[in-house]
From Swiss-Prot:
This is UPF0102 protein RHOS4_03930. PANTHER family: UPF0102 PROTEIN YRAN. GO terms for molecular function: nucleic acid binding. Pfam families: UPF0102 (PF02021). InterPro entries: Restrct_endonuc-II-like, tRNA_endonuc-like_dom_sf, UPF0102_YraN-like. Belongs to the UPF0102 family.
């Protein structure tokens, strides 16, 4: 997949995942939020809890899951910490890390609380 095609496929996947969160009463507060440490695809809220969402797209859900590396998780943790610093409760804000897997047919599988800091 070329860089441009990959970029638009990723955007489409993120949009589909954002719709799922919005429809389930967990509004997306930020898209592609960028901090010094890295980028977070989507940030949603469920009451007072902040949900950091990493979206992975590939031919299958298993292939998408395999694309999430430890190094990438570390960057997400760093960016999440930066985001939480701006919250009223700071690092004490309830939060979780979800992973949304999107396959070639556009089917979405969400793994809530997929990894922890």
């Amino acid at each position: 997949m070329s860089g441009e095609v990959s970029y638009y496929a990723g955007q489409t996947a993120e949009e589909a995942v954002a719709r799922i969160y919005d429809r389930s009463g967990r509004p997306v507060a930020a898209r592609r939020w960028r901090g010094v440490s890295g980028e977070i695809d989507l940030i949603a809220r469920e009451g007072a809890e902040v949900i950091f969402i990493e979206v992975k797209k590939s031919t299958s859900h298993a292939a998408a899951a395999a694309r999430l590396s430890r190094r990438q998780m570390d960057r997400i943790y760093g960016a999440a910490s930066e985001f939480l610093a701006g919250e009223p409760r700071g690092q004490l804000t309830a939060s979780r890390f979800d992973v949304a897997l999107v396959d070639a047919l556009g089917r979405v599988e969400i793994i809530e609380n997929a990894f922890a800091a």
